[in-house]
Amino acid sequence: MKNYTFDTVIELEVLKNYLSRAASAAFLIHTKTLSDDLRAIKNLGIKFLGRASGYWYPDSDEEKHFGMSEELAEKVHEIDPEIILQACIFEAVYRPVDRIPIPACVFEAFGMTSENRCFSFEQMRFPKAPEGFWWGEDGALPDITQLETRLWFYYRAVRYIEAGYEALHLGQIHLYTADDRGMVKMGELMEMIRVYARKHARRHLVLMDAHSHGISIRGKLLLDYHAMPYTRYPVTDREGDRLVLVKEGFSEGGFNPNGFESSSMPYLMEYDNWGGKVINDFASVTKEERAWSDWWGYDQIGWFANQTQDAQGKFLEYTALWSVVNHAFFEIPFRRTLDAAAVPMKRGDNGQMDVQDYYQINENSPDCPMGFSQEETIKRIWESEEALREVETNPENSADYGAKHVYDEETGIKLPERVVVYGSFQPYVGAVENDSNSEVTRMYYIGNNTYTLSVVIPFAGEYDYAVSTYGTLSSTYSHDTYPRSGSSNKGYFTVLNDNTVVRFIFHFMNHTVTIRQWHYNLLLKPESQ
């Protein structure tokens, strides 16, 4: 049994347990299928409900918004009091904030004299109006160095904590802190929020994340864990709008606000949204142009929702495997807006065609007539957790490839810092084919003259490969222990099933390359080849 117990601080193991059962449930307070959503939450065993409340543009009734937020939290905690609900404070403010009164407690928290006034939109904007930071006259990125912005963020954090929320997503933190040199004001604000949570939160703690690979100030991290969207590489030689995931950056390590230290903090990854589509008319562009326009002309969740049900299931499985190999936590898509990527589908209550503007993971039924029916896929993925632990992963700190100033003990030969595995498989892991200098397929030194790299190959087939030392083609290794020069000398390996984990192992002094494979058919036990 996993441990989900915490109070005031959270241990690393418990934090990871929560993130391993995380779901993105965007604006769940507005769902039209709450009863079935609660059933699905319980059925799946979700422990972290991301983005369950919040808004980008202010709701018409502020008190109603927080009333609905509190009501949702109460109903969720009735089915499982251990669940963490997350609310959002995004990188956006609009003029309607001018009608929201500032409570006296907010002024008092900042040591100010209470005033009978509302928030001021004008006082939150960046004064110099950098390009793209002002959105016409009525919208803008807030500037955290402005006191009014910090009053706004603190107010919203306090209201969500009072409503039963124990996590906050702080959006694109590096944008609204652009003028906050050294993150001084942001750090002060976050400490104020934590102080409030220690007194008033359900379990005396609020977890804060943002879209960031990490903010470390003299070794101390601002965020409790990190969050980021996935990054893709389009695959154009397969039928359909196919893509693979690629590693982008890493998660910063240091001293966590909860008192523990790690070389790399846990990070949560999601299918993000930003309007549904980035190309209105797909017929107006070439296939190549659309492939490289975000996710085939969609945002991330829009692309995912517009795949077939079978393709969705396979991509969920692929994402889970990719995340395990790269030490990420997959925040499954439970509910997410589709906007312009809305999907025509048959209703589960009357059999009529309709258009779904939200992705819902629920089984399609009269109780959730526009569900995408992926509950069982997620259950199989999460039930396979023990088997997934057998996978040999890449190092937790993915930015450290090792082999710096390492020498073979017997001969004194210096080992190369840069070793790359390349070949025809590379486009299916997000690299250029036959690129012997690729950072994407650079191998990690793990000691004992050995370099490794684990990847997930989504398509069955035969692939060629070779290992290049120093990223050059002067001495490459593959099927035997003898070096070759040039790009044409390679070995071959066969992937029998889609979504197979492949691990390349290169022993520098022995000049051997070994390939191990794990296939996870989630209905069966894993196979080792």
Give the ranges of each region predicted by the language model:
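Aromatic-rich carbohydrate-binding modules that target alpha-glucans
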Residues: 412-460, 470-493
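Surface-exposed flexible segments
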Residues: 344, 349-352, 359, 469-487, ...
